[in-house]
């Protein structure tokens, strides 16, 4: 662990310097609502840039049964379709000289339209963005293109060349079986085929309403602009249907395994476990320390990264999460505005060579079990707190990201960055250990593996026999070899009725 702690300390120092350079002083927020529209205004008069965000608490959880993919397809029709005054090609032509774009993305309970523009072009950009959301064209050619794009993602991208995402989605399908989160947000093949343009119009009219809306403006905008922009959205209906009812977070006691049969040169692995914790719960913050210690996304801090990659060379990286995580573009940071009302614990193992994949799975569970049984080491606790206090500031380092996390605070009731800044200095190791024992564990797991020879993988795990590691070079230290002997026998109890093997071409069909 000496290497791990040194890396933690160095990353913390880097984060301190970066945070001081990149994060501006907190801006005074504007009105919380304008004309019945919830708002977040973050003025930074010295900035030449202005960020706009239009957030709807609408997502794939709102999809009707049999029409999975409707909510995100509707969002694509707004963000990647024409308006009543312009075709989509004309929208793109109008955006080009502004050096701006309208980005649209969504998840289970969120749809976001956002963009950043120089303040000299703000009026034109705001007009374009508002027209896209408030006066969609709903043209037949836009519908055909966007629906085909969604279908291609599900049937070609996910099934074809995105094994890591395939593994994550396969895990989520089992973890959230018969749950509004159970299908890919983009939909299923049959669901997308069943959607009509009239379905899109109806969902837009019923769900894109003010009680599910937050409008955000940040940066160097002129006086009166933010209020005027928000007022434009007062034309939307006042109320949408109630948020979809979610079943209670299940207490799962037995492990479940899904192996997706696919011609794969390396095996992608995802592990999930339901947890009844979100940002509004006190335990979320000590769990955040635990997951950062175990596997901070795409950094060398985590135990999983050190033990699996650095010491054993098993894969590119291994990470842990205690809430839904989507990487924001090319950064290493979480995408804002994808909060959910229910969350899960997840471990993501980047693809592993077939001969070592089951050892890597056992190694990840071995380290998780060790954290649950022994607690977080005092030195690791202190180093992780220091790192996380600084690194979390980087999550909101520009106007658009600050705005996104401020909108999340409106929706969830907690500003995760500010909560970490306030809680970390006072947090005790005992709080982390207690939260880990209460919410984490290596039982009740949903495990997905994308692999060739899928039935053999399933049979090997069900047999309970050891699965060792094959090193490319000699000279492995004796203490690592001794630990390998423990890991290769780490138990993963599985019963036949909880094991499924699926051919990839059947995944996400309906």
What are these regions (language model features)?
Residues 8-17:
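Bacterial N-terminal signal peptides
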Residues 27, 34-37, 46-53, 65-70, ...:
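Extracytoplasmic
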Residues 53-116, 182-186, 298-327:
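M16/MPP (pitrilysin/insulinase) zinc-metallopeptidase core fold and M16-derived inactive scaffolds
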Residues 149-170, 248, 252-266, 311-329, ...:
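Short acidic/His-enriched helical or mixed secondary-structure segments at domain edges of catalytic enzymes
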Residues 168-169, 197-232, 444-445:
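Non-catalytic, conformational "gating/processing" segments within enzyme and secreted inhibitor domains
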Residues 177, 214-277, 296, 451-455, ...:
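An aromatic/glycine/proline-enriched structural segment found at the starts
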């Amino acid at each position: 662990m000496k290497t791990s702690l040194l890396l933690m300390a160095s990353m913390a120092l880097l984060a301190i310097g970066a945070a001081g350079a990149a994060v501006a002083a907190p801006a005074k927020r504007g009105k919380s609502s304008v004309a019945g529209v919830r708002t977040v205004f973050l003025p930074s008069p010295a900035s030449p840039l202005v960020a706009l965000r239009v957030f709807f608490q609408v997502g794939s959880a709102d999809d009707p049964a049999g029409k999975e993919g409707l909510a995100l397809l509707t969002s694509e029709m707004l963000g990647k379709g024409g308006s009543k005054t312009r075709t989509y090609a004309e929208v793109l032509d109008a955006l080009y000289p502004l050096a701006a774009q309208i980005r649209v993305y969504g998840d289970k309970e969120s749809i976001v339209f956002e963009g950043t523009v120089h303040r000299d072009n703000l009026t034109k950009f705001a007009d374009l963005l508002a027209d896209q959301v408030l006066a969609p064209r709903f043209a037949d050619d836009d519908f055909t293109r966007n629906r085909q794009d969604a279908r291609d993602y599900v049937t070609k991208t996910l099934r074809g060349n995105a094994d890591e995402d395939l593994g994550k989605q396969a895990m989520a399908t089992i973890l959230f079986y018969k749950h509004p989160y159970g299908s890919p947000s983009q939909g299923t093949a049959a669901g997308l085929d069943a959607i009509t343009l009239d379905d899109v119009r109806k969902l837009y009219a019923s769900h894109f309403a003010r009680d599910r809306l937050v409008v955000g403006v940040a940066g160097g905008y002129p006086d009166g602009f933010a209020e005027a922009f928000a007022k434009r959205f007062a034309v939307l209906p006042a109320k949408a249907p109630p948020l979809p009812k979610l079943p209670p977070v299940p207490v799962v006691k037995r492990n479940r395994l899904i192996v997706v049969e696919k011609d794969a040169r390396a095996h992608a692995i995802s592990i999930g476990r339901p947890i009844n914790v979100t940002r509004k719960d006190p335990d979320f913050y000590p769990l955040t320390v635990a997951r950062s210690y175990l596997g901070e996304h795409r950094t060398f801090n985590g135990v999983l990264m050190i033990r699996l990659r650095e010491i054993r060379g098993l894969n590119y990286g291994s990470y842990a999460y205690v809430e839904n995580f989507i990487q924001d573009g090319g950064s290493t940071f979480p995408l804002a505005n994808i909060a959910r009302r229910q969350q899960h614990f997840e471990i993501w193992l980047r693809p592993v060579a077939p001969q070592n994949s089951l050892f890597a799975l056992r190694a990840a569970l071995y380290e998780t079990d060790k954290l649950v049984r022994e607690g977080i080491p005092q030195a690791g606790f202190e180093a992780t707190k220091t790192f996380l206090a600084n690194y979390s500031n980087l999550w909101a380092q520009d106007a658009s990201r600050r705005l996104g996390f401020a909108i999340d605070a409106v929706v969830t009731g907690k500003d995760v960055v500010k909560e970490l800044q306030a809680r970390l200095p006072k947090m005790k190791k005992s709080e982390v250990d207690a939260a880990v024992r209460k919410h984490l564990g290596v039982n009740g797991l949903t495990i997905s593996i994308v692999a060739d020879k899928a039935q053999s993988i399933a049979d090997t795990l069900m047999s309970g026999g050891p699965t060792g590691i094959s090193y490319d070079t000699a000279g492995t230290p004796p203490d690592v070899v001794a630990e390998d002997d423990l890991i290769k026998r780490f138990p993963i109890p599985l019963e036949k009725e909880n094991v499924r093997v699926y051919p990839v071409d059947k995944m996400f069909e309906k």
